[in-house]
Regions:
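Peripheral interaction segments used for macromolecular assembly
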Residues: 1-179
Length: 179
């Protein structure tokens, strides 16, 4: 019995990738991934911020994406050119979550988020699943300049603080529910 690995992409590696329509014409470039936190340990991708001609950033819903692979994103070709505006409850992976400090749940210290992996589940939703982090070294500021901590990829459940503190996240989700 063989198992097929779920499709996965890393957000920071996808930035700068061309978005193609079904006939192969390049229509945009990926600039960010928009996610909506579901719980403390999950977030669902709802789309991409893409850049079209004249540096205009627009929203491409994930439902209009037919394929994501290294070097290319293929869409249905339908693109709304209204300027992107972040809504309440949405987070940008590159703009909001990268370089965020997180704490390991096992008490082994803190880390900085370098990249975020999204996996496709059986319902075809893209969910945040793993974080590529750099462990922070204890010590003064000079120690941080000289040596870097180790990098590792961990499950989302292995850290806390990605979406803010519990109080910040609760207030954020409550405000989103009323709008």
């Amino acid at each position: 019995m063989s198992t097929v690995a779920a499709p996965r992409f890393y957000a920071a590696r996808l930035v700068g990738t061309s978005v193609f329509d079904p006939i192969g014409d390049s229509v945009a470039t990926v600039r960010d991934v928009v996610v909506v936190p579901q719980t403390r340990t999950s977030a669902r991708a709802v789309g991409f911020v893409v850049e079209v001609a004249a540096k205009r950033r627009v929203f491409l819903p994930i439902t209009r994406v037919t394929s994501i692979s290294p070097g290319q994103v293929i869409s249905t070709g339908v693109l709304n050119v209204r300027r992107f505006e972040k809504r309440t409850g949405e987070l940008l992976v590159i703009g909001d979550l990268l370089d965020r400090a997180v704490t390991f749940t096992d008490g082994s210290g803190e880390a900085t988020v370098l990249d975020i992996a999204l996996d496709q589940n059986r319902h075809r939703d893209w969910m945040v699943s793993r974080l590529h982090v750099r462990r922070r070294r204890p010590g003064g500021s000079f120690g941080r300049l000289v040596s870097r901590g180790e990098t590792l990829t961990v499950e989302l459940s292995a850290v806390t603080g990605l979406y803010g503190t519990q109080a910040e996240q609760s207030a954020h989700l409550l405000a989103a529910a009323y709008q």
